[in-house]
Amino acid sequence: MIQILELFGGIGSPRCALRNLGIPTKAIDYVEIDEKAVRSYNAMFADELPYKTQSVVGWNLKPDILIHGSPCQDFSIAGKQKGADEGSETRSSLMWETIHIIQQMGAWKPRYVIWENVKNVRSKYMVHNHNRYMDEMRKLGYSNSFALLDARDFGLPQARQRYFTVSVLDGNPFDFSDLIHTPMRNVSDFIDKDSDVSDYYIVTQPSMLSRIDEVSDCDSEFRGRVPVIKDFTMTITCKQMRCPNSGVVKISDGKYRYLTELECWRLQGYSDDDYYRALSVNPGKQKCLNGALYKQAGNSIPVPIFESLFRKIILGETAEVNTDVEIEAEQSGQLKFA
């Protein structure tokens, strides 16, 4: 039985991954401030933790793996980049609460700690917080490594790059180079037929229609533009209703629609059953887009990435070394490229 602690747990991506792998799991606690996300989590996992937790006393917990994806808004380019300095009281500075919790655990520190955050966490203005986080983890007995992982390398047709930092207690740095990757699936496997999608997903606002770009390469920067989905979507965000960064689906010449909430959940690796359980407790308004379920998808972490991490950490399953993956490991306080 693997015991996990989920901080900033959202809708439970790591727990979904463990479930999909058939690994017996006990969630000893789950911390999430969004009440609607808590509803979805408990609907998906049989109400094992039917309460919202906002504080954790570390010394009462004995997890094997601690997972945290602290708020990204103050790291993100899309936000105001306020940063995450300890004591700054920004949302992203909550990352230091994880350090405080582990400090309280004493001899019961988790064997593995996994932290996920946006690509901009390694930008020149933000990198000092990431480096200090790893330094604090090293003081607690952990070796650290991190890599930029893309959901497209794990089967999902979504361009979503995020840094994953894995800290190992009293062991060698985690090696990302032999993670099992999965070929990207066809985006049509995730998108419903237009005839099955309600008309209220059709883009009608002139201001939005004027921003749709069918020509540019989907890998290019789309500042102020909205891409048309071809081989894959761009990053699913929590603001799909207002600014569909992911792109829009072309119905016919000059006619487009938004991704549905269900499609966004699929593109993060969730099953249709997961989505419908969440919908049952967050039904939204009739004939309106469901902002809560869009937000939950946009704030989540791709389930297949956790599946690959857990296949290595727990099951010992690896692939041939991938020399194309850029990995950084902290050894004796120095960052080195592997």
Residue ranges of predicted features:
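Short, well-ordered alpha-helices that flank and scaffold nucleotide-derived cofactor binding pockets
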Residues: C16-N20, A43, H100-Q103, D135, ...
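N-terminal Rossmann-like NAD(P) cofactor-binding module of classical short-chain dehydrogenase/reductase
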Residues: L5, I65-I67
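C-terminal target-recognition/interaction regions appended to catalytic cores
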Residues: P206-A338
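SAM cofactor-binding core of SAM-dependent methyltransferases
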Residues: I2-V57
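Short glycine-/small-residue-rich Rossmann-like dinucleotide-binding loops
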Residues: P71
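A structural signal for well-ordered alpha-helical segments within the folded catalytic domains
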Residues: G12, E35, W96, V127-N131, ...
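Class I S-adenosyl-L-methionine
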Residues: G58-I65, F75-R242, K255-R257
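Short, glycine/charged-enriched secondary-structure capping and boundary segments
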Residues: R19-I23, A43-A46, G79-G83, V127-H130, ...
